[in-house]
């Protein structure tokens, strides 16, 4: 039985700041069959693609990237906010929907030529995911695809990712 995932996404107005319509995925995560459906869908998409790693973007990208890496039997590479990784890092600054931030990835996380899928929960303006892709490429690896659970189409984040194959499960 296929679950309508949109029924499990809660809209929270004015969070984290006024004017933002936040898509809360926690009801979906609390629904075991729905969460399984998301991971099963991603796993079916990426099985047999000869990927070397799944790259997860802090923090909610970890929720989907870790079980996907497990299912595919490949490594998980976390991309984190500044000061969270204990080793030498690559870093990139980026703009997001409601401010700016920086992301980091361990310098030794990916071998040159490694093929990866980058996973995050929501694509808004595309700034965070574009920065994650930049970090992957700085390491000499190749972004095979970017995947997000939710795409906020009015914010046109996909345009920032025009050089990458992109997949989203839900569009708003």
Curated annotation (Swiss-Prot):
Homodimer. It is found in: Cytoplasm. The lineage of its organism: Bacteria, Bacillati, Chloroflexota, Chloroflexia, Chloroflexales. Belongs to the purine/pyrimidine phosphoribosyltransferase family. This is Adenine phosphoribosyltransferase. Gene3D superfamilies: 3.40.50.2020. CDD domains: PRTases_typeI. One of its GO terms (cellular component) is cytoplasm. Its EC number is 2.4.2.7. Keywords: Cytoplasm, Glycosyltransferase, Purine salvage, Transferase. Catalyzes a salvage reaction resulting in the formation of AMP, that is energically less costly than de novo synthesis. The keyword Cytoplasm applies. It holds the Pfam family Pribosyltran. The gene is apt. It comes from Roseiflexus castenholzii (strain DSM 13941 / HLO8). Pathway: Purine metabolism; AMP biosynthesis via salvage pathway; AMP from adenine: step 1/1. Disulfide bonds: none annotated.
